[in-house]
C-alpha cells in the first residue's frame, strides 16, 4: 500500500486506518494537517508530529492542537528556547469513539519552519 499525502485517512486490510499529512509550512494562523471523520468503530490512535526546525529561532512560539468533535483533546504551546529547539513532540496516543471528527492543527508565531503529521489507528 502506498500512502500519499492527504488531509484525510486511508483504510487498510483489517480495518486499521493510516494518515500522512505531507509537509506544511508553519504560519501564524493554524495550518490543518489532518481533518477526518473516524470510521464507525473505536480506534486506538497514535499521532506523531515531525517538525523541521531549520528556520525556527529562539523566542518564537510554536503550538499544536488535537481536536475531537470540536473539543480540544490536547493543546501544547511553548516559546522556543535554547533547551527545546530541535526537540520533536512526543507521540500522542488515545482512543477515538466511532464517527468522531478529528482535526490536527499547528501554528508558529513567525511563519517559520514546517511540520508533518503521521497517524495510525488500530481498530479495537
What is each residue range found by the language model?
Residues 1-124:
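Beta-strand-centric surfaces of beta-sandwich/beta-rich domains
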Amino acid at each position: 500500500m502506498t500512502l500519499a499525502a492527504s488531509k484525510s485517512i486511508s483504510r487498510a486490510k483489517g480495518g486499521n486506518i493510516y494518515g500522512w499529512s505531507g509537509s506544511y509550512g508553519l504560519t501564524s494562523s493554524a495550518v490543518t494537517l489532518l481533518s477526518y471523520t473516524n470510521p464507525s468503530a473505536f480506534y486506538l490512535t497514535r499521532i506523531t508530529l515531525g517538525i523541521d526546525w531549520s528556520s525556527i529561532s529562539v523566542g518564537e512560539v510554536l503550538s499544536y492542537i488535537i481536536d475531537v468533535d470540536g473539543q480540544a483533546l490536547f493543546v501544547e504551546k511553548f516559546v522556543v528556547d535554547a533547551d527545546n529547539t530541535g526537540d520533536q513532540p512526543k507521540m500522542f496516543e488515545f482512543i477515538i469513539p466511532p464517527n468522531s471528527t478529528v482535526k490536527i492543527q499547528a501554528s508558529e508565531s513567525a511563519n517559520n519552519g514546517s511540520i508533518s503529521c503521521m497517524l495510525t489507528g488500530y481498530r479495537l
